[in-house]
Protein backbone atom coordinates (compact mmCIF):
# COMPACT_ATOMS: atom_id res chain seq x y z
CA UNK A 1 0.00 0.00 0.00
CA UNK A 2 1.23 3.47 -0.92
CA UNK A 3 0.87 5.63 2.19
CA UNK A 4 1.49 8.87 0.31
CA UNK A 5 -1.61 8.76 -1.90
CA UNK A 6 -5.31 8.07 -1.47
CA UNK A 7 -6.13 4.38 -1.23
CA UNK A 8 -9.71 3.30 -1.82
CA UNK A 9 -11.26 1.53 1.19
CA UNK A 10 -12.84 -0.86 -1.28
CA UNK A 11 -9.39 -2.18 -2.13
CA UNK A 12 -7.91 -2.07 1.34
CA UNK A 13 -10.86 -3.19 3.48
CA UNK A 14 -14.09 -4.19 1.78
CA UNK A 15 -14.07 -5.83 -1.66
CA UNK A 16 -12.69 -9.28 -2.44
CA UNK A 17 -9.70 -9.85 -4.71
CA UNK A 18 -12.05 -11.49 -7.23
CA UNK A 19 -14.27 -8.42 -7.56
CA UNK A 20 -11.29 -6.09 -7.55
CA UNK A 21 -9.84 -7.99 -10.51
CA UNK A 22 -13.09 -7.78 -12.47
CA UNK A 23 -12.86 -3.98 -12.21
CA UNK A 24 -9.10 -3.88 -12.79
CA UNK A 25 -7.34 -2.35 -15.80
CA UNK A 26 -6.06 -5.80 -16.73
CA UNK A 27 -9.56 -7.28 -17.06
CA UNK A 28 -10.70 -4.21 -18.96
CA UNK A 29 -7.93 -4.11 -21.55
CA UNK A 30 -7.84 -7.87 -22.06
CA UNK A 31 -11.56 -7.66 -22.78
CA UNK A 32 -10.89 -4.89 -25.30
CA UNK A 33 -8.56 -7.23 -27.13
CA UNK A 34 -11.09 -10.08 -27.03
CA UNK A 35 -13.61 -7.71 -28.60
CA UNK A 36 -11.18 -6.66 -31.33
CA UNK A 37 -10.53 -10.33 -32.07
CA UNK A 38 -14.28 -11.07 -32.18
CA UNK A 39 -14.79 -8.13 -34.55
CA UNK A 40 -11.97 -9.28 -36.82
CA UNK A 41 -13.27 -12.86 -36.86
CA UNK A 42 -16.80 -11.77 -37.70
CA UNK A 43 -15.56 -9.42 -40.43
CA UNK A 44 -13.46 -12.24 -41.90
CA UNK A 45 -16.42 -14.62 -41.84
CA UNK A 46 -18.60 -12.04 -43.59
CA UNK A 47 -16.14 -11.51 -46.43
CA UNK A 48 -14.12 -8.44 -45.51
CA UNK A 49 -10.41 -8.28 -46.24
CA UNK A 50 -9.34 -9.60 -42.83
CA UNK A 51 -7.15 -12.70 -42.99
CA UNK A 52 -6.95 -15.66 -40.64
CA UNK A 53 -3.24 -14.97 -40.27
CA UNK A 54 -4.01 -11.50 -38.96
CA UNK A 55 -6.55 -12.95 -36.53
CA UNK A 56 -4.04 -15.51 -35.25
CA UNK A 57 -1.52 -12.72 -34.70
CA UNK A 58 -4.11 -10.82 -32.65
CA UNK A 59 -4.86 -13.93 -30.60
CA UNK A 60 -1.16 -14.51 -29.93
CA UNK A 61 -0.98 -11.18 -28.11
CA UNK A 62 -4.42 -11.14 -26.50
CA UNK A 63 -3.08 -11.27 -22.94
CA UNK A 64 0.44 -9.78 -22.99
CA UNK A 65 -0.63 -6.16 -22.96
CA UNK A 66 2.21 -3.67 -23.45
CA UNK A 67 0.98 -1.13 -20.92
CA UNK A 68 4.07 1.08 -21.05
CA UNK A 69 3.71 1.52 -24.79
CA UNK A 70 0.01 2.33 -24.45
CA UNK A 71 0.79 4.93 -21.79
CA UNK A 72 3.30 6.64 -24.09
CA UNK A 73 0.75 6.74 -26.90
CA UNK A 74 -1.86 8.19 -24.54
CA UNK A 75 0.47 11.05 -23.65
CA UNK A 76 0.60 11.79 -27.37
CA UNK A 77 -3.01 11.12 -28.46
CA UNK A 78 -4.94 11.94 -25.25
CA UNK A 79 -7.27 9.10 -26.25
CA UNK A 80 -7.27 5.81 -24.38
CA UNK A 81 -8.80 3.65 -27.11
CA UNK A 82 -6.50 4.84 -29.90
CA UNK A 83 -3.53 4.49 -27.55
CA UNK A 84 -4.32 0.81 -27.10
CA UNK A 85 -5.07 0.35 -30.81
CA UNK A 86 -1.56 1.56 -31.63
CA UNK A 87 0.04 -0.39 -28.77
CA UNK A 88 -1.68 -3.58 -29.95
CA UNK A 89 -0.61 -2.77 -33.49
CA UNK A 90 3.05 -2.64 -32.47
CA UNK A 91 2.74 -6.21 -31.19
CA UNK A 92 0.77 -7.29 -34.27
CA UNK A 93 2.34 -5.47 -37.24
CA UNK A 94 0.58 -7.63 -39.85
CA UNK A 95 -2.83 -7.05 -38.23
CA UNK A 96 -2.25 -3.40 -37.37
CA UNK A 97 -4.32 -2.12 -40.26
CA UNK A 98 -7.48 -4.06 -39.40
CA UNK A 99 -7.64 -3.51 -35.63
CA UNK A 100 -10.84 -1.62 -34.71
CA UNK A 101 -11.99 -1.72 -38.35
CA UNK A 102 -15.28 0.17 -38.71
CA UNK A 103 -15.65 0.59 -34.95
CA UNK A 104 -15.93 3.56 -32.64
CA UNK A 105 -14.56 3.83 -29.11
CA UNK A 106 -17.82 2.62 -27.62
CA UNK A 107 -17.40 -0.70 -29.41
CA UNK A 108 -14.70 -1.64 -26.90
CA UNK A 109 -15.74 0.71 -24.09
CA UNK A 110 -19.44 -0.04 -23.83
CA UNK A 111 -19.27 -3.71 -24.74
CA UNK A 112 -16.55 -4.16 -22.12
CA UNK A 113 -18.74 -2.42 -19.55
CA UNK A 114 -21.56 -4.89 -20.22
CA UNK A 115 -19.19 -7.87 -20.12
CA UNK A 116 -17.71 -6.58 -16.87
CA UNK A 117 -21.14 -6.15 -15.29
CA UNK A 118 -22.06 -9.67 -16.35
CA UNK A 119 -18.90 -11.09 -14.80
CA UNK A 120 -19.46 -9.08 -11.62
CA UNK A 121 -23.12 -10.15 -11.44
CA UNK A 122 -22.06 -13.78 -11.71
CA UNK A 123 -19.79 -13.32 -8.69
CA UNK A 124 -22.61 -11.55 -6.85
CA UNK A 125 -24.92 -14.46 -7.69
CA UNK A 126 -22.39 -16.95 -6.35
CA UNK A 127 -22.13 -15.12 -3.05
CA UNK A 128 -25.88 -14.57 -2.86
CA UNK A 129 -26.47 -18.32 -3.23
CA UNK A 130 -23.96 -18.99 -0.45
CA UNK A 131 -25.66 -16.42 1.76
CA UNK A 132 -28.97 -18.20 1.15
CA UNK A 133 -27.37 -21.52 2.07
CA UNK A 134 -25.95 -20.08 5.28
CA UNK A 135 -29.24 -18.58 6.47
CA UNK A 136 -31.14 -21.70 5.41
CA UNK A 137 -28.95 -23.86 7.63
CA UNK A 138 -29.59 -21.52 10.56
CA UNK A 139 -33.35 -21.43 9.91
CA UNK A 140 -33.55 -25.21 9.80
CA UNK A 141 -31.56 -25.63 13.01
CA UNK A 142 -33.76 -23.22 14.97
CA UNK A 143 -37.13 -23.71 13.27
CA UNK A 144 -38.68 -25.14 16.45
CA UNK A 145 -37.18 -22.71 19.01
CA UNK A 146 -39.95 -20.35 20.22
CA UNK A 147 -39.08 -16.69 20.67
CA UNK A 148 -40.94 -13.49 21.30
CA UNK A 149 -42.20 -11.81 18.16
CA UNK A 150 -42.10 -8.05 17.76
CA UNK A 151 -44.26 -5.59 15.87
CA UNK A 152 -43.29 -1.91 16.22
CA UNK A 153 -40.46 -3.42 18.33
CA UNK A 154 -43.11 -4.11 20.96
CA UNK A 155 -43.86 -7.62 22.26
CA UNK A 156 -46.22 -9.50 19.95
CA UNK A 157 -47.34 -13.04 19.13
CA UNK A 158 -44.52 -15.58 19.53
CA UNK A 159 -42.73 -16.98 16.50
CA UNK A 160 -39.61 -19.14 16.24
CA UNK A 161 -35.99 -18.17 15.75
CA UNK A 162 -35.92 -20.14 12.50
CA UNK A 163 -39.14 -18.63 11.18
CA UNK A 164 -37.74 -15.14 11.75
CA UNK A 165 -34.68 -16.16 9.71
CA UNK A 166 -36.92 -17.16 6.81
CA UNK A 167 -37.90 -13.50 6.49
CA UNK A 168 -34.25 -12.72 5.79
CA UNK A 169 -34.17 -15.68 3.42
CA UNK A 170 -37.25 -14.58 1.49
CA UNK A 171 -35.62 -11.25 0.76
CA UNK A 172 -32.51 -12.99 -0.58
CA UNK A 173 -34.58 -15.35 -2.72
CA UNK A 174 -36.33 -12.36 -4.31
CA UNK A 175 -32.93 -10.76 -4.91
CA UNK A 176 -31.64 -13.91 -6.59
CA UNK A 177 -34.65 -13.91 -8.91
CA UNK A 178 -33.80 -10.34 -9.90
CA UNK A 179 -30.11 -11.15 -10.46
CA UNK A 180 -31.08 -14.09 -12.66
CA UNK A 181 -33.46 -11.89 -14.65
CA UNK A 182 -30.83 -9.22 -15.23
CA UNK A 183 -28.24 -11.82 -16.25
CA UNK A 184 -30.70 -13.46 -18.64
CA UNK A 185 -31.60 -10.19 -20.34
CA UNK A 186 -28.20 -8.47 -20.59
CA UNK A 187 -27.40 -7.38 -24.14
CA UNK A 188 -24.20 -6.13 -25.74
CA UNK A 189 -24.06 -2.81 -27.53
CA UNK A 190 -22.66 -4.61 -30.56
CA UNK A 191 -21.13 -2.76 -33.51
CA UNK A 192 -23.30 0.31 -33.95
CA UNK A 193 -20.90 3.05 -35.04
CA UNK A 194 -20.77 6.70 -34.09
CA UNK A 195 -24.49 7.45 -33.85
CA UNK A 196 -25.89 3.93 -33.74
CA UNK A 197 -26.71 3.70 -37.46
CA UNK A 198 -23.94 1.21 -38.41
CA UNK A 199 -23.09 3.56 -41.29
CA UNK A 200 -19.38 2.65 -41.27
CA UNK A 201 -20.16 -1.06 -41.41
CA UNK A 202 -22.77 -0.56 -44.13
CA UNK A 203 -20.01 1.11 -46.15
CA UNK A 204 -17.59 -1.76 -45.47
CA UNK A 205 -20.19 -4.31 -46.53
CA UNK A 206 -21.05 -2.39 -49.73
CA UNK A 207 -24.58 -1.59 -48.63
CA UNK A 208 -25.45 -5.13 -47.47
CA UNK A 209 -27.85 -4.56 -44.56
CA UNK A 210 -28.11 -8.25 -43.70
CA UNK A 211 -24.36 -8.49 -43.18
CA UNK A 212 -24.52 -5.53 -40.78
CA UNK A 213 -27.19 -7.32 -38.77
CA UNK A 214 -25.25 -10.58 -38.91
CA UNK A 215 -22.12 -8.82 -37.66
CA UNK A 216 -23.94 -7.87 -34.46
CA UNK A 217 -25.33 -11.38 -34.06
CA UNK A 218 -21.92 -13.00 -34.46
CA UNK A 219 -20.17 -10.62 -32.07
CA UNK A 220 -22.83 -11.33 -29.45
CA UNK A 221 -22.41 -15.07 -29.93
CA UNK A 222 -18.62 -14.92 -29.75
CA UNK A 223 -18.77 -12.95 -26.50
CA UNK A 224 -21.34 -15.29 -24.96
CA UNK A 225 -24.48 -13.15 -25.26
CA UNK A 226 -27.88 -13.93 -26.72
CA UNK A 227 -28.21 -10.62 -28.52
CA UNK A 228 -27.11 -7.03 -28.97
CA UNK A 229 -29.30 -3.97 -28.46
CA UNK A 230 -31.53 -3.83 -31.55
CA UNK A 231 -31.26 -0.03 -31.62
CA UNK A 232 -28.98 2.42 -29.84
CA UNK A 233 -27.18 5.70 -30.17
CA UNK A 234 -23.40 5.63 -29.94
CA UNK A 235 -23.70 3.99 -26.53
CA UNK A 236 -25.95 1.31 -25.11
CA UNK A 237 -28.99 2.72 -23.30
CA UNK A 238 -27.69 4.04 -19.99
CA UNK A 239 -30.89 2.76 -18.43
CA UNK A 240 -29.10 -0.62 -18.37
CA UNK A 241 -26.72 0.70 -15.72
CA UNK A 242 -29.74 1.81 -13.70
CA UNK A 243 -31.30 -1.65 -13.96
CA UNK A 244 -28.08 -3.31 -12.81
CA UNK A 245 -27.45 -0.91 -9.93
CA UNK A 246 -31.08 -1.14 -8.82
CA UNK A 247 -30.60 -4.90 -8.67
CA UNK A 248 -27.61 -4.38 -6.38
CA UNK A 249 -29.60 -1.89 -4.31
CA UNK A 250 -32.26 -4.56 -3.72
CA UNK A 251 -29.59 -6.84 -2.27
CA UNK A 252 -28.35 -3.97 -0.13
CA UNK A 253 -31.87 -3.46 1.24
CA UNK A 254 -32.09 -7.11 2.25
CA UNK A 255 -28.69 -7.14 3.89
CA UNK A 256 -29.35 -3.88 5.73
CA UNK A 257 -32.67 -5.16 7.11
CA UNK A 258 -30.90 -8.30 8.35
CA UNK A 259 -28.11 -6.28 9.95
CA UNK A 260 -30.61 -4.03 11.73
CA UNK A 261 -32.52 -7.02 13.10
CA UNK A 262 -29.32 -8.62 14.30
CA UNK A 263 -28.10 -5.45 16.00
CA UNK A 264 -31.39 -5.26 17.91
CA UNK A 265 -31.17 -8.94 18.84
CA UNK A 266 -27.61 -8.45 20.02
CA UNK A 267 -28.77 -5.62 22.28
CA UNK A 268 -31.41 -8.01 23.68
CA UNK A 269 -28.62 -10.59 24.19
CA UNK A 270 -30.62 -13.19 22.25
CA UNK A 271 -28.39 -13.61 19.18
CA UNK A 272 -24.96 -12.15 18.46
CA UNK A 273 -22.69 -11.90 15.47
CA UNK A 274 -19.35 -13.74 15.75
CA UNK A 275 -16.83 -12.10 18.08
CA UNK A 276 -13.18 -13.13 17.87
CA UNK A 277 -11.29 -14.24 20.97
CA UNK A 278 -8.92 -11.26 20.89
CA UNK A 279 -11.31 -8.77 19.27
CA UNK A 280 -11.63 -5.39 21.02
CA UNK A 281 -15.05 -3.78 21.00
CA UNK A 282 -14.09 -0.38 22.40
CA UNK A 283 -10.84 1.41 23.16
CA UNK A 284 -12.41 2.79 26.35
CA UNK A 285 -14.97 0.18 27.44
CA UNK A 286 -13.17 -3.15 27.58
CA UNK A 287 -16.36 -5.15 28.16
CA UNK A 288 -18.01 -4.04 24.90
CA UNK A 289 -19.03 -6.58 22.22
CA UNK A 290 -20.00 -4.21 19.44
CA UNK A 291 -21.76 -5.66 16.35
CA UNK A 292 -19.09 -4.18 14.09
CA UNK A 293 -19.74 -6.46 11.10
CA UNK A 294 -23.47 -5.84 11.11
CA UNK A 295 -22.82 -2.13 11.40
CA UNK A 296 -20.52 -2.29 8.40
CA UNK A 297 -23.20 -4.12 6.42
CA UNK A 298 -25.64 -1.32 7.25
CA UNK A 299 -23.09 1.36 6.39
CA UNK A 300 -22.10 -0.08 3.01
CA UNK A 301 -25.73 -0.89 2.19
CA UNK A 302 -26.67 2.76 2.53
CA UNK A 303 -23.89 3.57 0.08
CA UNK A 304 -25.18 1.10 -2.53
CA UNK A 305 -28.78 2.25 -2.19
CA UNK A 306 -27.86 5.92 -2.59
CA UNK A 307 -25.33 5.15 -5.32
CA UNK A 308 -28.14 3.69 -7.46
CA UNK A 309 -29.32 7.27 -8.01
CA UNK A 310 -26.18 8.01 -10.04
CA UNK A 311 -26.99 5.88 -13.10
CA UNK A 312 -30.60 7.04 -12.89
CA UNK A 313 -29.52 10.66 -13.24
CA UNK A 314 -27.00 9.71 -15.91
CA UNK A 315 -29.60 7.88 -18.00
CA UNK A 316 -32.04 10.78 -17.76
CA UNK A 317 -29.41 13.38 -18.69
CA UNK A 318 -28.11 11.84 -21.94
CA UNK A 319 -28.59 14.03 -25.02
CA UNK A 320 -29.71 12.54 -28.33
CA UNK A 321 -27.20 9.93 -29.59
CA UNK A 322 -24.74 10.53 -26.72
CA UNK A 323 -22.97 13.00 -24.45
CA UNK A 324 -19.82 12.41 -22.44
CA UNK A 325 -21.17 13.54 -19.09
CA UNK A 326 -21.97 9.88 -18.42
CA UNK A 327 -18.38 8.69 -18.53
CA UNK A 328 -16.76 9.94 -15.34
CA UNK A 329 -19.86 9.26 -13.24
CA UNK A 330 -20.47 5.69 -14.45
CA UNK A 331 -16.77 4.87 -14.22
CA UNK A 332 -17.03 5.47 -10.46
CA UNK A 333 -20.63 4.67 -9.54
CA UNK A 334 -21.12 1.31 -11.26
CA UNK A 335 -17.76 -0.10 -10.22
CA UNK A 336 -18.13 1.00 -6.61
CA UNK A 337 -21.67 -0.38 -6.40
CA UNK A 338 -20.28 -3.81 -7.25
CA UNK A 339 -17.26 -3.46 -4.97
CA UNK A 340 -19.53 -2.45 -2.09
CA UNK A 341 -22.13 -5.19 -2.57
CA UNK A 342 -19.31 -7.71 -2.81
CA UNK A 343 -18.03 -6.62 0.58
CA UNK A 344 -21.55 -6.66 2.01
CA UNK A 345 -22.19 -10.23 0.89
CA UNK A 346 -18.84 -11.39 2.28
CA UNK A 347 -19.83 -9.92 5.64
CA UNK A 348 -23.33 -11.42 5.42
CA UNK A 349 -21.92 -14.91 4.79
CA UNK A 350 -19.34 -14.50 7.54
CA UNK A 351 -21.88 -13.32 10.11
CA UNK A 352 -24.66 -15.81 9.35
CA UNK A 353 -22.19 -18.70 9.35
CA UNK A 354 -21.21 -17.96 12.94
CA UNK A 355 -24.30 -16.59 14.70
CA UNK A 356 -24.26 -17.16 18.46
CA UNK A 357 -27.68 -18.01 19.95
CA UNK A 358 -28.56 -17.75 23.65
CA UNK A 359 -31.58 -20.03 24.22
CA UNK A 360 -31.98 -19.23 27.92
CA UNK A 361 -32.20 -15.50 27.27
CA UNK A 362 -34.68 -16.10 24.46
CA UNK A 363 -36.81 -18.31 26.70
CA UNK A 364 -36.69 -15.88 29.63
CA UNK A 365 -37.86 -12.95 27.52
CA UNK A 366 -40.65 -15.01 25.98
CA UNK A 367 -41.84 -16.30 29.35
CA UNK A 368 -41.86 -12.78 30.78
CA UNK A 369 -44.48 -11.79 28.19
CA UNK A 370 -46.28 -15.07 27.54
CA UNK A 371 -48.70 -14.80 30.50
CA UNK A 372 -50.22 -11.67 28.95
CA UNK A 373 -50.62 -13.44 25.61
CA UNK A 374 -52.14 -16.53 27.22
CA UNK A 375 -54.91 -14.66 29.02
CA UNK A 376 -57.49 -15.41 26.33
CA UNK A 377 -56.75 -19.14 26.60
CA UNK A 378 -56.97 -18.92 30.41
CA UNK A 379 -60.26 -17.03 30.17
CA UNK A 380 -61.80 -19.58 27.77
CA UNK A 381 -60.74 -22.42 30.08
CA UNK A 382 -62.48 -20.67 33.00
CA UNK A 383 -65.64 -20.09 30.93
CA UNK A 384 -65.75 -23.82 30.19
CA UNK A 385 -65.80 -24.37 33.97
CA UNK A 386 -68.83 -22.09 34.34
CA UNK A 387 -67.30 -18.63 34.64
CA UNK A 388 -68.81 -15.40 33.31
CA UNK A 389 -66.87 -14.23 30.25
CA UNK A 390 -67.43 -10.49 30.84
CA UNK A 391 -66.53 -10.70 34.52
CA UNK A 392 -63.42 -12.73 33.75
CA UNK A 393 -62.37 -10.26 31.04
CA UNK A 394 -62.50 -7.36 33.51
CA UNK A 395 -60.56 -9.29 36.12
CA UNK A 396 -57.85 -10.17 33.57
CA UNK A 397 -57.62 -6.50 32.62
CA UNK A 398 -57.13 -5.50 36.25
CA UNK A 399 -54.62 -8.28 36.97
CA UNK A 400 -52.68 -7.45 33.78
CA UNK A 401 -52.43 -3.76 34.68
CA UNK A 402 -51.22 -4.65 38.16
CA UNK A 403 -48.67 -7.18 36.88
CA UNK A 404 -47.47 -4.66 34.30
CA UNK A 405 -46.91 -2.11 37.05
CA UNK A 406 -44.82 -4.61 39.00
CA UNK A 407 -42.57 -5.08 35.95
CA UNK A 408 -42.35 -1.46 34.78
CA UNK A 409 -42.62 0.55 37.99
CA UNK A 410 -41.08 -1.75 40.57
CA UNK A 411 -38.66 -3.58 38.26
CA UNK A 412 -40.01 -6.92 39.46
CA UNK A 413 -40.93 -10.17 37.72
CA UNK A 414 -44.22 -10.71 35.93
CA UNK A 415 -46.57 -12.15 38.59
CA UNK A 416 -49.71 -12.37 36.44
CA UNK A 417 -49.86 -16.17 36.73
CA UNK A 418 -49.80 -15.98 40.53
CA UNK A 419 -52.52 -13.31 40.56
CA UNK A 420 -54.85 -15.31 38.32
CA UNK A 421 -54.20 -18.57 40.19
CA UNK A 422 -55.08 -16.84 43.47
CA UNK A 423 -58.36 -15.45 42.09
CA UNK A 424 -61.21 -17.94 42.75
CA UNK A 425 -63.17 -16.55 39.80
CA UNK A 426 -60.87 -18.49 37.44
CA UNK A 427 -61.26 -21.83 39.23
CA UNK A 428 -57.73 -22.89 38.29
CA UNK A 429 -54.32 -23.64 39.78
CA UNK A 430 -50.88 -22.33 38.97
CA UNK A 431 -49.95 -25.76 37.61
CA UNK A 432 -52.91 -25.72 35.23
CA UNK A 433 -51.99 -22.25 34.01
CA UNK A 434 -48.35 -23.24 33.48
CA UNK A 435 -49.56 -26.20 31.42
CA UNK A 436 -51.29 -23.70 29.14
CA UNK A 437 -48.13 -21.57 28.98
CA UNK A 438 -46.13 -23.96 26.80
CA UNK A 439 -44.41 -21.73 24.22
CA UNK A 440 -44.95 -24.27 21.45
CA UNK A 441 -48.70 -23.75 21.83
CA UNK A 442 -48.40 -20.11 20.77
CA UNK A 443 -46.13 -20.16 17.70
CA UNK A 444 -48.84 -21.12 15.24
CA UNK A 445 -47.47 -22.74 12.10
CA UNK A 446 -44.02 -21.17 12.40
CA UNK A 447 -42.09 -24.50 12.48
CA UNK A 448 -44.16 -25.96 9.65
CA UNK A 449 -43.93 -22.77 7.57
CA UNK A 450 -40.16 -22.81 7.97
CA UNK A 451 -39.84 -26.47 7.01
CA UNK A 452 -42.15 -26.04 4.01
CA UNK A 453 -40.34 -22.93 2.79
CA UNK A 454 -36.95 -24.59 3.04
CA UNK A 455 -38.16 -27.72 1.27
CA UNK A 456 -40.29 -26.15 -1.45
CA UNK A 457 -38.40 -22.94 -2.21
CA UNK A 458 -34.86 -22.89 -0.84
CA UNK A 459 -33.69 -26.47 -1.38
CA UNK A 460 -34.51 -26.40 -5.13
CA UNK A 461 -32.53 -23.15 -5.45
CA UNK A 462 -29.52 -24.64 -3.70
CA UNK A 463 -29.75 -27.83 -5.74
CA UNK A 464 -29.96 -25.87 -8.99
CA UNK A 465 -26.92 -23.79 -7.99
CA UNK A 466 -24.90 -26.44 -6.15
CA UNK A 467 -21.86 -25.73 -8.32
CA UNK A 468 -21.74 -22.23 -6.78
CA UNK A 469 -21.68 -23.42 -3.17
CA UNK A 470 -18.59 -23.45 -0.97
CA UNK A 471 -17.29 -19.91 -1.33
CA UNK A 472 -14.55 -18.84 1.08
CA UNK A 473 -14.79 -15.28 2.38
CA UNK A 474 -12.13 -13.22 4.10
CA UNK A 475 -13.04 -10.23 6.26
CA UNK A 476 -10.60 -7.36 6.73
CA UNK A 477 -11.50 -5.85 10.07
Per-region residue spans from a language model:
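Active/binding-pocket-proximal capping segment
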Residues: 272, 395-402
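Long, amphipathic alpha-helical stalk/connector segments used for oligomerization, subunit docking
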Residues: 303-389, 395
Amino acid sequence: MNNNTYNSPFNARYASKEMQYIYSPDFKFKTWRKLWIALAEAENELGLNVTKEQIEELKAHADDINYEVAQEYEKKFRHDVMSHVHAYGEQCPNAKGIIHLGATSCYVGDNTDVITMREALMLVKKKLVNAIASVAKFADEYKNMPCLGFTHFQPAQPTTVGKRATLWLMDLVMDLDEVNHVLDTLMLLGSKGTTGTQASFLELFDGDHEKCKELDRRIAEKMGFKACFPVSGQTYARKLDTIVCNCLALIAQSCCKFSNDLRLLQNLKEIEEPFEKNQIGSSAMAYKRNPMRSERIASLSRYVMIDALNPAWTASAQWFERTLDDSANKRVSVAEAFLAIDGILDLYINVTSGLVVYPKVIEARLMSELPFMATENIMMDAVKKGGDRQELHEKIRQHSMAAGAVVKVEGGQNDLVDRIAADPAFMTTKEEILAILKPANFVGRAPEQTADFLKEVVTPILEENKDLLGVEVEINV
